[in-house]
Amino acid sequence: MSKVIQKKNHWTGRVHECTVKRGPQGELGVTVLGGAEHGEFPYVGAVAAAEAAGLPGGGEGPKLAEGELLLEVQGVRVSGLPRYDVLGVIDSCKEAVTFKAVRQGGRLNKDLRHFLNQRFQKGSPDHELQQTIRDNLYRHAVPCTTRSPREGEVPGVDYSFLTVKEFLDLEQSGTLLEVGTYEGNYYGTPKPPSQPVSGKVITTDALHSLQSGSKQSTPKRTKSYNDMQNAGIVHTENEEEEDVPEMNSSFTADSGDQDEPTLQEATLPPVNSSALAAPITDPSQKFPQYLPLSAEDNLGPLPENWEMAYTENGEVYFIDHNAKTTSWLDPRCLNKQQKPLEECEDDEGVHTEELDSELELPAGWEKIEDPVYGVYYVDHINRKTQYENPVLEAKRKRQLEQQQQQQQHQQQPQQPQPPQPEEWTEDHASVVPPVAPSHPPSNPEPAREAPLQGKPFFTRNPSELEGKFIHTKLRKSSRGFGFTVVGGDEPDEFLQIKSLVLDGPAALDGKMETGDVIVSVNDTCVLGHTHAQVVKIFQSIPIGASVDLELCRGYPLPFDPDDPNTSLVTSVAILDKEPIIVNGQETYDSPASHSSKTGKVSNMKDARPSSPADVASNSSHGYPNDTVSLASSIATQPELITVHIVKGPMGFGFTIADSPGGGGQRVKQIVDSPRCRGLKEGDLIVEVNKRNVQALTHNQVVDMLIECPKGSEVTLLVQRGGLPVPKKSPKSQPLERKDSQNSSQHSVSSLRSLHTASPSHSAQVLPEYPPADVPAPDQTDSSGQKKPDPFKIWAQSRSMYEDRPMSPSPASGLSKGERDREINSTNFGECQIPDYQEQDIFLWRKETGFGFRILGGNEPGEPIYIGHIVPLGAADTDGRLRSGDELICVDGTPVIGKSHQLVVQLMQQAAKQGHVNLTVRRKVVFTVPKAENEVPSPASSHHSSNQPASLTEEKRTPQGSQNSLNTVSSGSGSTSGIGSGGGGGSGVVSAVLQPYDVEIRRGENEGFGFVIVSSVSRPEAGTTFAGNACVAMPHKIGRIIEGSPADRCGKLKVGDRILAVNGCSITNKSHSDIVNLIKEAGNTVTLRIIPGDESSNATLLTNAEKIATITTTHAPSQQGTQETRTTTKPKPDSQFEFKGPQATQEQDFYTVELERGAKGFGFSLRGGREYNMDLYVLRLAEDGPAERCGKMRIGDEILEINGETTKNMKHSRAIELIKNGGRRVRLFLRRGDGSVPEYGGSNYENIPSFPGMTP
């Protein structure tokens, strides 16, 4: 709400003063009720009409009304005082009593807890009233906390020091008026005693400190408590959100007793009910009240046993104590017959006298009059913001529809009946979406179509379930189980699987599907359990432990959790994310709110509302309704969702197109929404009927779907979230329409305008970077200048604006042929999409540092990248920074082409200041095929639109790959501790040797199978003569994997020098660039080879050289396909063999079993997936079990821990396996050379750079 409207409707405008004289017998005729001991403001009870006349200045004035809140009595501020103190103040007045009172409203009512749990700008009347309440409460009550006493603190005076259990019991009993967490400790303000202690009330002398405007105050509380109170203050528009510590102003007493000092901003607190959690939605959706105050005041009382509550951000939500549920939506609006938008009258100039309400806007809409940006409208229920009056917009659309219907009706008799279209043809554009099929699906499971009416089936008896029962066992990783749950918000509602998290335990297990009903957890039946109860069960399971789940398949979700027109559903992500603390409760981030906090898909961006055209006109955009998070999320992790669709007479009801970034087919348009329930535009199709289709061409996928008989059911596994799909320039749209008839898109989206998009698509999130500067027709002023985004104005005015994660927009719709035509056209420069997008990121430093690592900058001109993001660190909490981002500036200082050391120094300076402003750029994953004779660029992405992208590739940092053996950083300075090694290949290639091309083709699930060795520590002697120029060739074949495509082709030998990859010269390229070139080549790579000098082969694998196996497996599914290890033995060349001692080769691999000693197992580790390296033995403790066994040595690579492979294993997982293995640990190792690889970056955390562990 803008400041102007807030000022008009603010409660301070309703405050009035009234003087009441006593009667002849001293009676006042005014009854005072409430009081802080009841958790209420003092308020007026019964009033004698004759005595209630206000007499300011001797004349008649306003009267006291029953129910009005008393703010002052005889100049004494009484808010927060118990009733007996208020009566004491009144009794001290002999003849007349002056009251300052205010009528109750939506924000200020008699509930003290409600008012204290709101957040206000410091210095505002609301904030001052909160401080008055607290000051008065402290006169009788001592705040309580769970932290230990500090020096000089007196128990019972400064604080009542309680255990966590005692505190939670106290909160659950309703004794605490205000509760919160600060720095990992609970704080609370209890109610005053119901009776004054020893019969004492506030003395007359003490009243002076309560006089309005008095400079005196109550005894000061300690700093930590004041900090806790101040942390709830809403900042002004110009203040940074990080200016004050984060704080939870309320929490749920039964929501866990996790003792974790790290705090995240809370979403919604419960009010006066410890058993209820507030409705949970994507935390990026921080909106003010869903109804304006004016609407709340005119809707009448709430239904029985309903309660209105407020979050710490002032957001309204509602508690149904009958069903023990919470909701964003006002039940008064749900029960009220809402007037259709088009039937409302224009609200321009229509206002009520008192509250300036817009009478003709439907419930849930709010009109904002901003003095700078003008008028705009907020739909709080469907969460959208627009400039256009929604009533006028609805009338205009209805009029347009009527005109179109009339035109169609006039043309219908003159046109022959069109033939029945094929499911993938353009004829769909004129076909009315068919209704849901009436025929049953082909499988014996219960029908998957949603019930047309009535309450969905529910039972608490598992034997009454009719679907297919599935049993699965999942191990909880450090990031959870990897699935999200919806439901359980109504008394009789199933808890069902909403989606799986990519690469999470549930997705890797492969048994769970969207819609599966959770029947039991560890043999405990949970049918009928609430959402919060089941979440608590999952959260109580320790990391590393397993859970047995019984699921029932056959009951579809009774609602679409992504549909903005349905009620928001409380959901908690039991997913593969780091746990965070919200309201004292361990929970996990949402996959939808966090396109991937860990940066697994490194090209995801936080999304912000774009232009008003995106907000208002394009209804395919809106706010994310993936209600799957309890705390601030940072990016959206890809979800795997199962959708069942029955093929109807007109087909499946959706169209597909090539994914612009490669990786398969995306859903381009939903033609038949009822039939495609659960499917969304932009979804990437991973499997069709359990068959992976990411490697198939567009036509192959279309043929597969066409072959399905009508009436049969197809099961689609789709990936939602992940790589963003850039928008096309408007200049390219005519080209798309022109060529759409001959394209392979099979899409009709070109025939849809911005204003006719289906409302069901509005759950997609607005992109952060707006498209080209083209405003929508109805979003421009008379001068043609684009208006600012109304949502941004509104959200900033509420001091709640923050970034939103980006969901994928629908596929851009360009087929391969169209993209080729676009590129070769003269308009290419106008429609070209930039390769990079830049972003400024401001970070506050935490106690543990900025929480990210810096990589690169070791060679002149080498880019500097963001490496590992520390979970729960400053960068992770902020959420915008991603692993792989290229660093452009640090606090305004450009660092492009600068050294690693300079960036380290800049970061150290920033650490002293406590904050840093980073400018980063992120590559847009959208590439177009090169012209036929054009040389590919090493920075290009996949060259084939049909090439499936391996998501494991996205985990690597740009300067090296996951496949690197030792180090991925360039320069000899990064190889310290590895050894200098012997001389490189020194043979000179004769001038008579001619280069030749070798083409290697690989299968779907295999790598190319060769190793490139790049000499970086000294100049190479191998040369060739090209154009009389002597060119060094530092890159050569180091290994060939037996049985691999490189081995089968028979044209490569160890020692061969590589001149070019896919026609691109690599003589001056870094090792990582070559690795990326080959990875991006798809299934075929062409190498230009000069036969090598075999005399140099014996020194190819020295430690000073960088080695990387080019065996990237472009797996269509990320579940179970791993990259080939670099430890594979090379196939001995026909003229060369390794001649190492036989005894050494026998000991290359060995197993040890260690028994835990008094100080652990006596060794420490280095490496892990998060550091882009394998696991190595870093140190051996003197006289420890590892040293005493006599086999283990520093530098040995750990291949298995307790039988579990370490391939792609995280460092934390390795420690977890060792710690949870009991008294013994069994290790399978490969003998190293005594050196341990260094990490490839600098660490900006105040934790050990190399998290070695001596378990």
Curated annotation (Swiss-Prot):
Q: Where is the composition biased (Pro residues)?
A: 434-444
The PDZ domain is annotated at: 17-105, 471-553, 642-720, 840-922, 997-1093, 1151-1233
Task: Give the membrane topology.
Answer: Peripheral membrane protein
Per UniProt, what is one GO molecular function of this protein?
Answer: ATP binding
In residue numbers, the region (Disordered) covers: 208-227, 235-265, 395-462, 585-622, 719-820, 932-984, 1111-1142
Where does the record place the modification Phosphoserine? Answer: 357, 729, 740, 799, 1070
UniProt cross-references to CDD domains, sorted A to Z: PDZ0_MAGI-1_3-like (cd06730), PDZ1_MAGI-1_3-like (cd06731), PDZ2_MAGI-1_3-like (cd06732), PDZ3_MAGI-1_3-like (cd06733), PDZ4_MAGI-1_3-like (cd06734), PDZ5_MAGI-1_3-like (cd06735), WW (cd00201)
Q: Which spans of this chain does the record mark as coiled coil?
A: none
The taxonomy runs: Eukaryota, Metazoa, Chordata, Craniata, Vertebrata
Keywords, comma-separated and alphabetical: ATP-binding, Cell junction, Cytoplasm, Membrane, Nucleotide-binding, Phosphoprotein, Repeat, Tight junction
Q: Outline the extent of the Guanylate kinase-like domain.
A: 96-287
Spell out the GO cellular component terms annotated for this protein, sorted alphabetically and separated by semicolons. adherens junction; bicellular tight junction; cell periphery; cell projection; cell-cell junction; cytoplasm; membrane; nucleus
Q: Where does ATP bind?
A: 103-110
Example GO BP: signal transduction
Q: Which gene encodes it?
A: Magi1
Q: Where is the composition biased (Gly residues)?
A: 974-984
Q: Where does the record say this protein resides?
A: Cell junction, Tight junction; Cytoplasm; Membrane
Species this protein is from: Rattus norvegicus
Q: Superkingdom, according to UniProt? A: Eukaryota
Bias class Low complexity marks the residues at: 402-414, 741-755
What name does this protein carry? Answer: Membrane-associated guanylate kinase, WW and PDZ domain-containing protein 1
Pfam families from the UniProt entry = Guanylate_kin, MAGI_u1, MAGI_u5, PDZ, WW
The WW domain covers 300-333, 359-392
Q: What does this protein do?
A: Plays a role in coupling actin fibers to cell junctions in endothelial cells, via its interaction with AMOTL2 and CDH5. May regulate acid-induced ASIC3 currents by modulating its expression at the cell surface.
